[in-house]
């Protein structure tokens, strides 16, 4: 039931996650933050089995910060994506694999180029210009495919995200309680104010 969306642009990566923490058809929490900052320029959003998601996200966050403390430098988004993929692949071959789907995005601290990685519970890893997990895949990928281009600005990226969330409100029969939206730029991670109360008319 969770919604994850990611968009890259000229010099930024936007990651958005639905606020509703759900179990079946029941909403347990209406202000759940499904994102974790791994370092100053890398952000991860997660969905999946309730216990697995938070445990795996915090494990990844702790390992990223441990590396930074030991080596005096942060891992790049690409290095972190491959580390996460390796951990998921190892977990997949254990008796109790993590059931976690992830979007990992950031801006390289050296080249200042944005990147976004799509990972699923089977340890698949793909570098993509935009991505979605959950029900958002069915409704938003066509919109992103039509309107996205590599040189969009942050303002245009937020407008594109609005198009996606409007479509979800119009088509999905569930209330995902709005979105937590964050952007990663060369200056770090910033919270984006997002209008969750916008009423969308049916087509």
From Swiss-Prot:
Compartment annotation: Cytoplasm; Nucleus
CDD domains: proteasome_beta_type_2
Protein name stated in the entry: Probable proteasome subunit beta type-4
Species for this entry: Neurospora crassa (strain ATCC 24698 / 74-OR23-1A / CBS 708.71 / DSM 1257 / FGSC 987)
GO cellular component: cytosol; endoplasmic reticulum membrane; nucleus; proteasome core complex, beta-subunit complex
Biological process, per Gene Ontology: proteasomal ubiquitin-independent protein catabolic process; proteasome-mediated ubiquitin-dependent protein catabolic process
Alphabetical UniProt keywords: Cytoplasm, Nucleus, Proteasome
PANTHER family xref list: PROTEASOME SUBUNIT ALPHA/BETA (PTHR11599)
Family in the record: Belongs to the peptidase T1B family.
Organism superkingdom: Eukaryota
Pfam family, one: Proteasome
Subunit (UniProt): The 26S proteasome consists of a 20S proteasome core and two 19S regulatory subunits. The 20S proteasome core is composed of 28 subunits that are arranged in four stacked rings, resulting in a barrel-shaped structure. The two end rings are each formed by seven alpha subunits, and the two central rings are each formed by seven beta subunits. The catalytic chamber with the active sites is on the inside of the barrel.
GO molecular function list: endopeptidase activator activity
